[in-house]
Amino acid sequence: MEPVGVSHNTPEMDPPRNIQTPELPESGSVKDKIGKFSAYQQQPSGLKDAFGKTPTSIGANRSRTPQQIAAQLAAGRSTPGEITATHTGVSRTQGSRPTTSKRSDDNEGPPLLAPKPVWATSANTASVNKLLRSEADLPIRDKSIQRRPVAQISPIEAARLAAKKPRPPPVPRKPAAVATGPTSVPINVHSKGPESPEPTSKNHSSRHLEDTTIPFKAPPALPPRTGASSVPRKDLTNHRRLLDTNHGSRRRPSTPGTASLYTTSLSNSTTSLLDSSSGLDEGALSDAVVASSRASVRASQERKVPPPPPPERRARSRSLKQFPHTAKGEHTDSSSPSTHLRQTLREPTKIAENDEGYQRHKHLIRKHPHKHHEGDRRRWRSEITEKERKRYEGVWAANKGLLLPPAHLRVPEAYPPESSEMVVNLVAADIWSRSRLPRHVLAQVWDLVDGQHIGLLTREEFVVGMWLIDQQLKGHKLPPRVPASVWGSAKRISGVHIHGLPPA
């Protein structure tokens, strides 16, 4: 059984994928080295049997293969960066290799591209010392990050550049453009090519430095000045410098290099504006004043004033009612009518003083319509209205003659001959009780209207009793006796009105 990792069929070993193949060594050097170490392969069979039988002791007696020696010698003559990568690959392979190295011949896995680990033997001590010596002779690469020199600008030069730099009018509510300047470019610490493989720690430090050198985000632009909008378009060409210097002195710089000058330029913004305006032509300033005045005049003229309302037409009937005799407090409407409020109600017709009706009904016009007049309220107690009398007579006509015995059974002493036109006391009590007045109040009403005391009510008595109940329901008190005017209004014949007879 052959030792593990030794292959006689492959004379040369493929280099790793991540390492570029350097220049080939001189002819014969590889063969000499292979021949020098070929004696180590011819060992006694007892040692080979020990390799085959005891895999745990293979780390102490294992020899290096020709492929490993050739790869190590080739790596020794390559660039220092490649040597570092080779040693790194070897150390990683040593750390990740398990303790048992016995493999079967029928292994289907792909061959390892990395070289086999180097085991410490007495034969390869010279080669290792040679490699260490050659590595020590290499110059140590400075791994510090080199930064580009930052151009230093004095505050005076930065202020001059900011004042002289022509800038277009600012757009409102838009962020400023990407900052441009010598200090705004981030330092690129990553280099391209095979000669710049850096350790992982260097990459982390470069990322940290790159994050710290990111330029500050530009603040949003200031809104435009309101005074600039009143100038017409034709005059903007003459006064563009004044507007540019005004906006340029008040805008905050977006680059980190000039950020320290923002406070100084902001404090001296008024002085720079006056200095820049004094440098302009006097004719341009006068043109700006005239243009602003014209713009204000045009704005005031554009305001439309509503036309005055047309005068109201005077009615014809009003001119016909011009009486020669008028009261002292009255006056004719000679002036124009008021345009504030239009009159919607008609004016009351004016009546002459010599008219009899005006003098007779003058007391009906009251200055205080809500004032109480107790003397004028006596009329309701004096008579019954025609409407009320007709309603009460309808109730009497529907209930007269009820509960009376027939005419041939009536006693002449108990019932008068007109008893069929009367209302029985039981029927009257039933009708009046529907008013929900107390029984003693209804008894008082019965005593006031019952003049015959026979238990029957005539038409006038029933009508007056109904009227008294309605007055009680309206809130009026019962009188001690019924006035004669009330009895007279109840005895009228319906449909006939006799005001007075002519003299005979």
UniProtKB/Swiss-Prot annotation:
It holds the Pfam family EH. Coiled coil: none annotated. Residues 388-493 form the EH domain. Residues 360-372 have a biased composition (Basic residues). GO terms for biological process: lipid metabolic process. Residues 135-145, 232-244, 344-359, 373-382 have a biased composition (Basic and acidic residues). Residues 1-123, 135-264, 292-382 are annotated as: Disordered. This is Increased rDNA silencing protein 4. Positive regulator of phosphatidylinositol 4,5-bisphosphate turnover and negatively regulates signaling through the cell integrity pathway. Involved in rDNA silencing. Keywords: Lipid metabolism. Belongs to the IRS4 family. The keyword Iron does not apply. InterPro entries: EF-hand-dom_pair, EH_dom. Residues 54-70, 85-101 have a biased composition (Polar residues).
